[in-house]
């Protein structure tokens, strides 16, 4: 299995069977950039995780999991919840598994299969039919898009870093802060992310809202942090995107 030692030292034990589960209960969970030789299926049963790639950010709520192919550089932060679950899949596994990065919507069967493997830490032997079903359900699971492509233009680096503290401004305000025209900013965003800036900003706000809710923030607190004019405006925005209210969505994290 892949295990964690101090200072983000990752080790692979090649003796494990086709699939091995790893559960972390570290309250200060934050793994820096690293990669693995195995494919991974990662989820937080009662919290959410933020996965950062070199040019993309993904937020994974507890009703979803992320599939990471081998050798992809990534960092992981767990937000809320009591544990993080990772399944490692050997590249030599004899069953069909996803070969691309994807976010899976979990059903009750897939959740049960993941729990069966991940929490059996003292039992490395699983019946082949169980592993086959786990791989099949992972491959066939419906997909969802909770990702945010990141621009790489050097003019935007300082601004992107500031988003750790402040929500992205509307285009006119942001362009003045950067010192570029709205047309230039719009062109950069569409070229490098495939999204218009306002679309990108809405996606950022949505993912940040999910992170805040997972950390126990109130709906009103989310609205204030994300600079919505009213709590009602935030609720409307969230419901348009997620087809449920923020209060209802918070139940995933309870």
Residue ranges, per PLM feature:
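Short hydrophobic/aromatic patch on the recognition helix
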Residues: 63, 185, 189, 233-234, ...
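Short acidic-glycine-tyrosine-enriched beta hairpin
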Residues: 55-70
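Terminal helix-turn-helix DNA-binding modules in bacterial transcription factors
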Residues: 191-231, 235, 251-254
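Amphipathic alpha-helical segments enriched in hydrophobic/aromatic residues interleaved with Lys/Arg
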Residues: 95-164
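Ligand-binding loop in jelly-roll beta-barrel domains
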Residues: 72-101
């Amino acid at each position: 299995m892949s295990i964690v030692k101090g200072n983000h030292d990752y080790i692979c034990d090649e003796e494990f069977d086709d699939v091995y589960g790893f559960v972390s209960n570290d309250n200060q969970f934050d793994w820096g950039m690293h990669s693995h030789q195995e494919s991974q299926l990662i989820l937080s049963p009662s919290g959410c995780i933020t996965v950062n790639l070199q040019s993309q950010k993904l937020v994974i709520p507890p009703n979803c999991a992320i599939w990471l192919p081998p050798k992809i550089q990534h960092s992981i932060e767990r937000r809320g919840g009591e544990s993080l679950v990772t399944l490692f899949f050997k590249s030599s596994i004899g069953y069909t598994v996803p070969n691309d990065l994807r976010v899976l919507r979990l059903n009750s069967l897939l959740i049960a299969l993941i729990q069966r493997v991940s929490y059996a830490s003292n039992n490395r032997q699983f019946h082949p039919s169980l592993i086959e079903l786990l791989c099949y359900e992972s491959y066939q699971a419906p997909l969802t898009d909770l990702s945010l492509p990141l621009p790489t233009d050097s003019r935007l680096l300082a601004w992107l870093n500031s988003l750790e503290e402040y929500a992205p401004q509307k285009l006119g305000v942001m362009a003045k802060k950067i010192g570029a025209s709205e047309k230039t900013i719009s062109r950069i965003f569409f070229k490098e992310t495939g999204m218009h800036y306002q679309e990108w900003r809405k996606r950022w706000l949505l993912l940040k809202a999910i992170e805040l809710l997972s950390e126990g923030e109130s709906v009103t607190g989310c609205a204030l942090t994300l600079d919505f004019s009213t709590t009602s405006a935030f609720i409307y925005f969230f419901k348009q995107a997620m087809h449920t209210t923020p209060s209802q969505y918070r139940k995933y994290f309870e």
